[in-house]
Amino acid sequence: FGVLSQAREDEADNDQENETVKEVMLHIPFQTAPSPDLDGDGIPDALESDGDATDPNSDWDNDGVSDIQEQAIGSNPYDSDEDGTGADFVANAYPNKFDLDSIYGYVDEEQTFNLVVSRSNYFLRGLDPNSNFEEAQEYYSNHDFSSFIGETLFNGEVTIDNEEQLFRDNEDDPETDVDESLEVTSRLAPGIHVPLDNAFFQENILDKEGQTELLSQSNFRNFLRGIHLSGTNADDLMFLLDLTQANITITYEYDDYDSEADEIVTAERDFVLSFLSGNAQSGISGNAVNVFENEMFPNPDIANALDNGENASRIYVKGGQTLAEIRLFDEMENGGSDIINQIKQNNWVINEANLTF
């Protein structure tokens, strides 16, 4: 993970690089569809009132500078304290806002839920052994993974935020008039962004350097099989997550030799574990499974009426759990077979059919 392989580190003439985890972050972005901006002022229409959505001279933050002007100078249209005239102003250094239409039940920016991230010990194989490994393995939403949940990596509250996260990694150059430390070097889309347990990744990633667990991709996938996500206090929320952009970033430090200064210095690197790759056009590589825990109908009369082999007088449907079948033409009742035969004999083409309750 440093400059030298573990085998080189273990040689007598070389010092250990002492790779140490500094930070581990899990990022799973929300799916965000392109949001229209009819007036071209840089603010999505979904975040503006009906009148402002078509008015480029609207002023979202009421700072006296129109949204279209703030877009031109690169000032923050959502912050009334920034209008581009400050002495320390840096253009385009503010977080963009997004319309989070991929979250069902999302009400406001202060909404929270509790998230538990754990190690998964269940191996999500890609091919089905029952088909001689010629077909993809199928997984169903009622599968029980509870006995395969390992160590807890995070357990805490997550706040839903529709803003990007900004990173400023530059150091200020004292010889310039601009404060480079205020410049945005990278942006992170809105989503779940939480720290994970450093000790776990120190033990299971960095300390495994040179061992069989990291010898090949197949060995690593069998060793670290995945993560398990579960939420509480989120009964009214449903998320669409973009797992193709999700990752775990391990930031670590190690001892490096500076040949010019002839000394050991502390260097820093990132190691990124991605979840899925690809897209709908090229295909998705990797496996992810979503499961649902559904309670049965609370009314015992409804539960007893389901799947009892008898024709029901009523139809009960529960999303994600039950299936209702309706027989339209019973062969023995209401002349059903005669109706079907008449349609066939006359070669009638049915353009439209409606079922009315």
Name what the model sees in each region.
Residues 1-33, 89-94, 196, 207-217, ...:
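A short beta-strand-loop element at or near the start of a globular domain
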Residues 4-7, 27, 31, 46-50, ...:
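Structured segments of extracytoplasmic/periplasmic soluble domains
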Residues 14-21, 40, 58, 62, ...:
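Solvent-exposed, acidic/flexible segments
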Residues 21-23, 74, 110-115, 224, ...:
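Extracellular structured ligand-interaction cores
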Residues 30-34, 74, 121-126, 254-256, ...:
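Short loop/turn segments at secondary-structure transitions that flank enzyme active sites
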Residues 33-36, 40, 74, 81-192:
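Beta-strand-rich interaction/scaffold domains
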Residues 36-90:
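Extracellular calcium-associated, cysteine-rich motifs in secreted modular proteins
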Residues 157, 161-308, 315-317, 348, ...:
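Proprotein-processing/basic-patch segments
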